[in-house]
Amino acid sequence: MNKILALLIVSLSLNFAAANNFLVSYEKKATFTKEELKAKWKENKIKEFITPVKYSVDVYEIIYKSRWHDGTEVLASGFYYVPVAFDGALPTMIMNHGTQLKKDFQVRLRGLQVGCIAFATDGYLSAFPHYIGLGKGEKSHLYQIAESEAYSNIDMLRAIREFNKEMGISSNHQLFLTGYSQGGHATMAAHKMIQEEYNTEFKVTASAPMSEAYDMTGVQAGVMYEKYNHQAYLPYLLLSLEKQYNFWDGDIYEVFKEPYRSII
């Protein structure tokens, strides 16, 4: 009896979309009311003339189909922030997050997710892709790999288009891209791929990549032999490049010293 009840609860909370090409499932994870957001804005001294609080915001976790570096299908995930009780068609905004080593993502009113919520409460449909290999997605994350970042954006756009149709949400086809740190790199990658390969499907209204890695080779050449604060970035990048391009002749792990090699 308990097992049947548990299955019923799961089936009610998760919505599967078998008829769609990209959207696999979605689940409402949270609602932020206007009152909560106004209080948060006041607490952090955010002026409403900068970021108006117009709507409460529902947050959905979206599971969708994307692609691995070899072209095979892979599941990816992201959060989707939807204004509550809005009228008319709304623009779409993608916010790309910075470097994250942990796979898990939780909905929270902090970090770049505040940016998504700020856009959503002002009347935008806001997407927050976790990137392939992070969140509820399959495989491991390919760090700073432009193709992987771009596909996580483009395929999530396709998934939320199917979600919008299912939920009766209207988009006005304006598309804004932004992101910070690795998210700036992902923003440029997505904009470039849309412009070069998918310009009949999507039109980017504007993009704002922020503080991205402009020159990874040049910067790493200057710091990789010195002590610096974020030692995990270089192996994260090297292992991702090896997965994507198979560039190392032999075992890539031989470049790391012990005891770090065993940990990595």
State the predicted function of each range:
Residues 4-13:
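Sec-dependent N-terminal signal peptides
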Residues 18-87:
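Catalytic-loop region of hydrolases
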Residues 69-77, 81-119, 136:
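Short, surface-exposed "cap/lid" segments of acyl-processing enzymes
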Residues 92, 120-130:
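A fold-wide structural signal in alpha/beta-hydrolase
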Residues 100-102, 126, 159:
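Serine-hydrolase catalytic-loop signature spanning alpha/beta hydrolases and amidase-signature enzymes
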Residues 143-166:
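Alpha/beta-hydrolase active-site loop
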Residues 159-229:
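Primarily recognizes the serine-hydrolase "nucleophile elbow" in alpha/beta-hydrolase
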Residues 210-264:
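Accessory cap/linker subdomain of secreted extracellular hydrolases
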